[in-house]
């Protein structure tokens, strides 16, 4: 098993995407990368801690390689706009990859360089993982538990449609 931490806007949205990927064993929403000694939703959304909304993705690389995890990540959020994903604005929504093992960094760098070679201006930050603060229970598996939530119904279906179209062989049936 491998673990990688990804920040691509609201963690409700990124969580929903990766819960739909074969070989992903778990997805935990949380916070990382800040300067405060703890993190919670209210403080992070207030911009007071420097933390980023992230998901911790634990996956079986024999089923879904890290390259595919990263390709899905970059395809299902906007890695070209600083501190913003759709209507979510603020540094807590920035695009970031936190690698948990030094062997992951070359793959992350290759993936970003491949996109840049295609003329895409990637602003995604890349850092070694630091302390992860698990989000409150109300934020875990949010969309599945709140299917009527308006923001999720606006933001998540297009991401899942893109996943289905571009990565169907890796999508949970």
Swiss-Prot record:
GO molecular function annotation: L-methionine:thioredoxin-disulfide S-oxidoreductase activity; peptide-methionine (S)-S-oxide reductase activity
Catalytic activity entry: L-methionyl-[protein] + [thioredoxin]-disulfide + H2O = L-methionyl-(S)-S-oxide-[protein] + [thioredoxin]-dithiol; [thioredoxin]-disulfide + L-methionine + H2O = L-methionine (S)-S-oxide + [thioredoxin]-dithiol
UniProt cross-references to Pfam families, sorted A to Z: PMSR (PF01625)
UniProt entry tagged with the keyword Oxidoreductase: yes
InterPro entries per the UniProt record, alphabetical: Met_Sox_Rdtase_MsrA_dom, Met_Sox_Rdtase_MsrA_sf
GO biological process, one term: protein modification process
Enzyme Commission code: 1.8.4.11
Key word Transport present: no
Active site: 10
PANTHER family: PEPTIDE METHIONINE SULFOXIDE REDUCTASE, PEPTIDE METHIONINE SULFOXIDE REDUCTASE MSRA 2
Name of the featured protein: Peptide methionine sulfoxide reductase MsrA
Organism listed in the record: Psychrobacter arcticus (strain DSM 17307 / VKM B-2377 / 273-4)
Originating gene: msrA
């Amino acid at each position: 098993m491998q673990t990688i931490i990804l920040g691509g806007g609201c963690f409700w949205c990124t969580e929903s995407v990766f819960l739909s990927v074969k070989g992903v064993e778990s997805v935990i929403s949380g916070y990382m990368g800040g300067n405060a000694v703890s993190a919670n939703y209210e403080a992070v959304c207030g911009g007071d801690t420097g933390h980023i909304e992230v998901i911790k993705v634990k996956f079986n690389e024999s089923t879904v390689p890290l390259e595919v995890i990263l390709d899905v990540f970059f395809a299902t959020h906007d890695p070209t706009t600083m501190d913003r994903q759709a209507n979510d604005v603020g540094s807590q929504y920035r695009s970031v990859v936190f690698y948990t093992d030094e062997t992951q960094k070359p793959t992350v760098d290759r993936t970003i360089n491949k996109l840049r070679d295609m003329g895409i201006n990637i602003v995604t930050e890349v850092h070694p993982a630091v302390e992860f603060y698990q989000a409150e229970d109300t934020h875990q598996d949010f969309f599945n538990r709140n299917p009527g939530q308006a923001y999720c119904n606006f933001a998540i279906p297009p991401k899942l449609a893109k996943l289905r179209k571009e990565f169907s062989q890796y999508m949970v049936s």
